[in-house]
């Protein structure tokens, strides 16, 4: 799964950062992702922490903050992720941060990049100055840095969300960060209404997992999923239930991240809260990649609920799109 959003900094922001690098006194440059999610633009240049706190207190969306202390020619690159900010925005900012840092350049940034969630805590940035020692850790690769950043955001989500799918006193990464929105218990739809096919999609605008289709599918051969974007599907065949995670080619990066980070939590919700035991968990790209033989009734030895862990993907079930080679020009 890609961990980059494709969003880049506007030239005006990069020019401002470069120009203010040699300025006297402290400089605080505030930036955010544009409403159309295509670029990062500068919103304000603050000259005091009081001004910074006032501006940040009015924001519900995350911010990027570049703080240059007096007497230092480097910025501290701060991620401000306010409590209560939308999940989609948090993930988008996490996946854009490293791209933005590369554009600004390592020569202009300190090795310390604080993550702050409360506007009042921004005043603590005054403790970051030229006297602070540089980090002694071995430099991380880009993928390692990106994964750490995403893990930070997911940890924040688990801390702030009221929905838990595992033990309430456990810090398990298998927690659900979205609320499941269903008028009836899902197991009741399967057991009482006779439906054996339920398809779910995530609505980031209100942070819920919703049922978009519930049907009776006579056989595996007639199973078909045709949705514009990722989805979770429960399919019941006889006494066996299957969970299908589909992420079609062309899905947006931010959607891929949201669905991937909530998959295990949703499976645990279905298992623990709805008492649905899955024989297999299948992950596919486009629906045409689904090997329907995987959805045949399985015996106890094959069932994931008898000795295997459904939270870990079965490698034999994973299928990926084969990259297409370049098209050759037809000779005439």
Swiss-Prot record:
- Specify one Pfam family: Cofilin_ADF
The highest taxon in the source lineage is Eukaryota
One of the entry's Gene Ontology molecular-function terms is: actin monomer binding
Q: Which GO terms describe its cellular component?
A: actin filament; cytoplasm; mating projection tip
Q: List the disulfide bonds.
A: none
Give the record's GO biological process terms: actin cortical patch organization; actin filament depolymerization; actin filament organization; actin filament severing; barbed-end actin filament capping; positive regulation of actin filament depolymerization
CDD domains the UniProt entry points to: ADF_Twf-C_like, ADF_Twf-N_like
- Where would I find the ADF-H domain in this sequence? 5-132, 173-300
Q: Where is the composition biased (Basic residues)?
A: 321-332
Location of Phosphoserine modifications: 167, 172
Q: Which InterPro entries match?
A: ADF-H, ADF-H/Gelsolin-like_dom_sf, Twinfilin
Q: Which Gene3D superfamilies match?
A: Severin
> Which keywords does UniProt give here?
Actin-binding, Cytoplasm, Cytoskeleton, Phosphoprotein, Repeat
Instruction: Tell me the function of this protein.
Output: Actin-binding protein involved in motile and morphological processes. Inhibits actin polymerization, likely by sequestering G-actin. Prevents actin filament assembly by forming a 1:1 complex with actin monomers, and inhibits the nucleotide exchange reaction of actin monomers.
Look up the further comments and give them: Present with 1470 molecules/cell in log phase SD medium.
- How does this polypeptide assemble, per the annotation? Interacts with G-actin; ADP-actin form.
By what name is this protein known?
Twinfilin-1
Species assigned in the record: Saccharomyces cerevisiae (strain ATCC 204508 / S288c) (Baker's yeast)
